[in-house]
Amino acid sequence: MLPIETHNPLFGKYLYPQAKAFMESQQDVSWSAQEIPVEDDKHDYLSVMSIPQRRLTDTTLQLFVEIEQRVGEVWNEFASWFPHSEIEGACTEIARMEKSVHAFFYQKMSDVLNIDPSTVAENQQTIAVLREKLGLLGQITSNLSANKPLSLFTVAAIEQVLLFSNFAMLKSFKAKGHNLIKKTLTGVDYVIQDRLLSCVGRNAY
């Protein structure tokens, strides 16, 4: 078997079939941001949620936009490291979900509410905890190729430190008697499904 970093010129000769199986599993559960009618949550945002709740949700969703774009870039870089068609396909499929689906889903509510992206960016820099998370994200992804084995754990670190803790915050709007932003949380559930699947796929390597 060719080493994982050695180019396999024979498309269709799958030396890492688990990568192809993962790619197909992700495609089987693929979805789009257009499918989630977050505009149905507009009343909750504008009339039910408190101003602090809404601001926290706005900045969290925009933080997720930044994270998803960075994570997508990470997976595209992984694809270039392992030149086997099945691995490239799997990594590219994850990157597509991150950059073309997840990021645009998180941005969708800001678009519905006509929130100025520059205003959100300013808020992210004035809220210390968000500024620190964005700084950590930049540090983790700044020089992936310097240590490839360590970098394979990069996405897991981003998911655990930056994403899942904030997923819990958003999910709290559907707990303890609350039933707010239902459509938004449906999309969050889809993202979590993709995240768990990518964890399984990454561990297979």
Predicted regions and their residues:
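Non-heme di-metal
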Residues: M1-Y205
